C-alpha cells in the first residue's frame, strides 16, 4: 500500500514518455546559474576545447534554443521529466529497511536536436570541400589529357576515388568542432539539472509523506563527452 501511494505521487509529479509539465516549474535564475557554473568549469579545466563565454544567461540560452530548433516552452517545461525508452524511476528497500531510489533519464530530446544540428553542419561543410576537390580534378584532367574522348571516363574514375577518400566522411573540425562540444556541455548540464530536479521532488515526497530522508546521492552518466580523453564520446559507457 505504501509503495502504491508513493508511485502515484511520483507519477503525478514527474511526467513520463513524451509528456512534459503543463507549466514551467523551475527557477530560471537557478537553472542558468547551474548551466553557467558547469560550462565555466569545463572552460577552466580544458582550455581551448570549447568556446569561451563570459556568462551563460537567459539570453544566451534563448539563442541556443532557437538555433537548434526547440521552443522555449518545451525546453523549460521538460524540467523535470523522465522521458521514455529505457528511462525509469525505481524505489526499493533492503531487508533491514534501507531504501534506494534510482532515476535513469537524460536530456529529454535536447541531445538528439544538438546532434542533428551539427550533423547538418558537417554534411554541409564536407559537401563544400568535396565539390571544390572535384572541380580541381576536372581542371587537371582537362589540362593534362589532350584526348577529349577520355575526359568523361577519367573524371568519373577520379570522382569515385574521391568518394572513397576518408576525408570525405562527414566530420567536424576547427570552429565547428568547438561549437559542437560547447553545445554538448550545455546539453549534459541540462540533463544533470533534470536529475537534480527529479531527486528534489522525490526527496520531498519521501520526507513529507513517508518520513524518509535522503542521506547520500550518487550521480553518474554513461552518454557523454569525456574531455579527459582528448576528448572521447562515451556512449553507454563510463570511464574505467
Regions found by a protein language model. Name each.
Residues 1-96, 112-240:
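Glycine-rich, flexible loop motifs
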Residues 98-100:
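Hydrophobic residues embedded in beta-strands of well-ordered beta-sheets
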Residues 107-109:
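Gly/Ser/Thr-rich loops at beta-strand to alpha-helix junctions
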